[in-house]
Amino acid sequence: MIRYTSLIMLGLLASSFYCLQTALAQTPLSPRAERGQTFARANCAHCHSIDKVSPSPLAIAPPFRTLHQRYPVEMLEEALAEGIVTGHANMPEFRLEPDQIGNLIAFLKTLER
């Protein structure tokens, strides 16, 4: 019985440590990145994963956390201003305002960490 209780306590301690480590690792977003996250949630999350772990709802839409592996996210600025037309097949064409672009880029950079 003591061994069983010890195992339970060890499990609880390990899970508590993991939760604490995860909470400490999450840094708060800057106001600009928060606005970018809000934009992404409203306009992009129907197809793309906009977090660090989830798969994209639409399989052909790359998760935002992997964009920096393809090219520097700063390179998206011009495409976002002129309108992205070469995304995945279901992606609508759109153009963003300069402040929206800066906000979205700031958010995308947080996913690189």
Question: Whereabouts are the PLM-identified features?
Answer:
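Short, non-ligating residues that shape and space the ligands of small metal-coordination modules
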Residues: 53-54, 73
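The canonical Cys-X-X-Cys-His
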Residues: 36, 41-50, 104
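Extracytoplasmic electron-transfer domains, predominantly the class I c-type cytochrome c fold
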Residues: 63-112
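Electrostatic cytochrome c docking/interface patches
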Residues: 21-39
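Short cysteine/histidine-rich zinc-coordinating motifs and their immediately flanking basic loops
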Residues: 56-61
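Activation segment of ePK-like protein kinases, specifically the conserved APE
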Residues: 52, 112-113
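Bacterial N-terminal signal peptides that target proteins for export
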Residues: 1-10
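Cleavable N-terminal signal peptides
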Residues: 11-12, 23
